[in-house]
A protein has these predicted regions:
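Active-site cavity-forming subdomains of large catalytic enzyme subunits
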Residues: 1-25
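Active-site/ligand-binding-proximal alpha/beta "capping" segment
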Residues: 18, 33, 43
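Aromatic- and glycine-enriched pocket-lining scaffold segments that form the walls
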Residues: 36-38
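Helix-coil-helix junctions within alpha-helical repeat/solenoid scaffolds
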Residues: 19-22, 45-292
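Short, amphipathic alpha-helical segments
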Residues: 8-15, 30-33, 50, 54
Length: 292
């Protein structure tokens, strides 16, 4: 149930399923340490995806300590990547993430592309984007794309969609409109609710670029709703922030405050920086379209 929900990008359903799986494996089965570790990892991963960032990072920290005690290279590699990366983003201390990523890859072959390599690259690119090292982040994600295709992992639509979200954000930040368009074109072919919500957000950002305030408000409001409905409030809160900026005045300030408050309650020390990363594009060139 948990994996079906994850592959459908419904983290709200996946979280309790993975937690129950871990409980059953611990109480009813023997010799299932690997399966329990994977259930724990995907529960933390789904918590981050769903926007329960603080729970995801606290769970990852606990499992990192356990992996170190047991000298578990596989578990350490998994937990030191995506769940752990968000700890340093929330702490607004991204420079400390690099040693974690290096530790995650220690002992793994360098000429293969396993899941730990995927999660490490995704995490490293996300942290670079948070640091506003936009071209560096874009380079990481473009290299990831080549490896995903070589490993034939693009057929896993949830994994590929998440990659495309981050590729798109990095391309927008770096001013690579052609890559942003290619990412949007690929997302259109993935029929998942969160993909539709993300694309609706791009329509809002594009409308803002061309000065069409009414369209920007309409698309951003719809994107916010669609992302929340898809169990991705972390994406929705970015569009809430941008909608507030678009509206201005007292109503806009209220939305901006709500977005900041939501992230602050998740432990974010610099919520505006997270929000700008999640929904970039308001400072783009009006003549350049984001969508194909």
């Amino acid at each position: 149930v948990g994996m079906i929900a994850m592959m459908s990008m419904r983290p709200g359903i996946a979280i309790p399923a993975f937690q129950e799986a871990e409980r059953l494996l611990a109480s009813e089965c023997r010799g299932t340490e690997w399966e329990r570790m994977m259930a724990r990892h995907f529960a933390c991963y789904a918590q981050v995806a769903s926007g329960d960032l603080d729970a995801g990072r606290r769970g990852a920290a606990q499992h990192v300590d356990e992996a170190r005690r047991h000298n578990d290279t596989f578990a350490l590699g998994m937990f030191m990547t995506t769940p752990r990366a968000w700890h340093w983003i929330l702490e607004d201390d991204p420079a400390k993430a690099g040693p974690d990523f290096d530790e995650a890859l220690r002992g793994w072959p360098t000429d293969e592309y396993y899941m730990v390599h995927h999660f490490e690259a995704l995490s490293r690119g996300t942290v670079s984007l948070y640091q506003q090292r936009n071209e560096e982040a874009l380079g990481i994600f473009l290299t990831m794309g080549q490896k995903l295709r070589a490993a034939m992992l693009t057929s896993l639509q949830a994994l590929f969609a998440e990659y495309l979200f981050w590729l798109s954000r990095a391309a927008i930040r770096a001013g690579d409109v052609a890559t942003a368009k290619r990412a949007a074109r690929s997302l259109r072919r993935i029929k998942l609710r969160i993909c539709e919500g993300y694309l609706e957000g791009l329509r809002g950002l594009e409308a803002n670029r061309r000065g069409d305030g009414a369209a920007a408000e309409r698309h951003l409001a719809r994107a916010m709703e669609m992302c929340d409905e898809a169990d991705f409030p972390l994406y929705g809160v970015g569009y809430r922030y941008r909608l507030g900026q678009q509206l201005g005045g007292a109503s806009g300030e209220r939305l901006i405050h709500q977005a900041r408050d939501w992230l602050t309650r998740q432990g974010a020390k610099n919520p505006d920086r997270v929000l700008d990363m999640m929904a970039p594009g308001f400072d783009g060139v009006a003549s350049q379209r984001l969508l194909p």
